[in-house]
Amino acid sequence: MSPQTETKASVGFKAGVKEYKLTYYTPEYETKDTDILAAFRVTPQPGVPPEEAGAAVAAESSTGTWTTVWTDGLTSLDRYKGRCYHIEPVLGEKDQYICYVAYPLDLFEEGSVTNMFTSIVGNVFGFKALRALRLEDLRIPPAYIKTFQGPPHGIQVERDKLNKYGRPLLGCTIKPKLGLSAKNYGRAVYECLRGGLDFTKDDENVNSQPFMRWRDRFLFCAEAIYKAQAETGEIKGHYLNATAGTCEEMIKRAVFARELGVPIVMHDYLTGGFTANTTLAHYCRDNGLLLHIHRAMHAVIDRQKNHGMHFRVLAKALRLSGGDHIHAGTVVGKLEGEREITLGFVDLLRDDFVEKDRSRGIYFTQDWVSLPGVIPVASGGIHVWHMPALTEIFGDDSVLQFGGGTLGHPWGNAPGAVANRVALEACVQARNEGRDLAAEGNTIIREACKWSPELAAACEVWKEIKFEFPAMD
């Protein structure tokens, strides 16, 4: 540290560098109901005390900079500064600490996830005093939550729009994700919806490419939806991806979807950005469209255990920004997640009030007040044999999305959809009869095969499929 030097022209101002912990480490601080609270996993550089590292995070993500400045005297730092108020070691990890930081609410623009993240994680992750930094959780106070619209509609309104109750919803991502013409794409949509699915879906990178422009896709998918609805008597939907290179183009696509009368559109909220996502969510609420959210790019941010951001933070941010569905892992299949941790952020998406529970990765009690809930979407390498586990784990307020598990059926797309619908109905009936899906799942599926040759064929194809890869990190 360089020495502090008092200038002749000042009284009380000392130029130079001082330790962050002298100002920003305040273990005596009592948090306020209006504070935004953050739990950071901090890995300091060798020789940096955890108190200094935690204080540095609080400083660099709020009012601090690397040196004392004249203009500190023109405001009240005690009112606006972030505070590291508690530090605890991470069990089983060397030189890792959970540092809790409290931010005054006045630091953040109302109704802006963009500003919230710019402040809390925008700059501090490149700080030299830290080897690694991960934002594990945020507590969003009700006073700040009430400045957001949140999901366009929420779980109950979606069920009322679809007139579907008492079971999970079924979906399918159209494959191959790229390369189909708009007409062939629409054909696949029709076959899946006609077979019994509630939704089909554009993949995250289906936007408006030379082989299939967005307007053509929207038209053929709308035709497929209306034809399937007429033949089944059920309300159907296809997640029309409105993600685009500009907000203006995105809204233009959403407007066209509304004019076609379809029930739902889609957005890639991380690659598209929170400003674009909130803009689209507001449009969807005002115009009666449901909004499906894909989390493309999330693993770039959340996969490393000691650096980045946990998905529960991204999930909370999405609930603030707005979305009626979001992909949330499966616990089974090719994109597995730890069961308790996954269910922790699933509850944060759906429930009005979630208690602190460190065993489930929930660092803070979260009260969502009246903000609508978000339906979690389970997708990625799942098939009919997973249906009992998925029904038990995710419950009714979920979307179970089978891409290859529908389109990979040996008899075609529609039989694949039939197989999934029969498997789901069998699991829901068994659950309602009091049977244990975890213990009797395979038996329940085999019994249903007697009444559905489509399900029997699917069970035969996928009976040996597992996604088991040795962990290398």
UniProtKB/Swiss-Prot annotation:
The modification N-acetylproline is found at P3. GO terms for cellular component: chloroplast. The keyword Oxidoreductase applies. One of its GO terms (molecular function) is monooxygenase activity. Substrate binds at N123, T173, K177, R295, H327, S379. Keywords: Acetylation, Calvin cycle, Carbon dioxide fixation, Chloroplast, Disulfide bond, Lyase, Magnesium, Metal-binding, Methylation, Monooxygenase, Oxidoreductase, Photorespiration, Photosynthesis, Plastid. It is an enzyme of class 4 (lyase). Its EC number is 4.1.1.39. It catalyses: 2 (2R)-3-phosphoglycerate + 2 H(+) = D-ribulose 1,5-bisphosphate + CO2 + H2O; D-ribulose 1,5-bisphosphate + O2 = 2-phosphoglycolate + (2R)-3-phosphoglycerate + 2 H(+). Binds 1 Mg(2+) ion per subunit. Residues 1-2 form a propeptide. Mg(2+) binds at K201, D203, E204. It is found in: Plastid, Chloroplast. The modification N6-carboxylysine is found at K201. Signal peptide: none annotated. Heterohexadecamer of 8 large chains and 8 small chains; disulfide-linked. The disulfide link is formed within the large subunit homodimers. This is Ribulose bisphosphate carboxylase large chain. It comes from Ajuga chamaepitys (Yellow bugle). The lineage of its organism: Eukaryota, Viridiplantae, Streptophyta, Embryophyta, Tracheophyta.
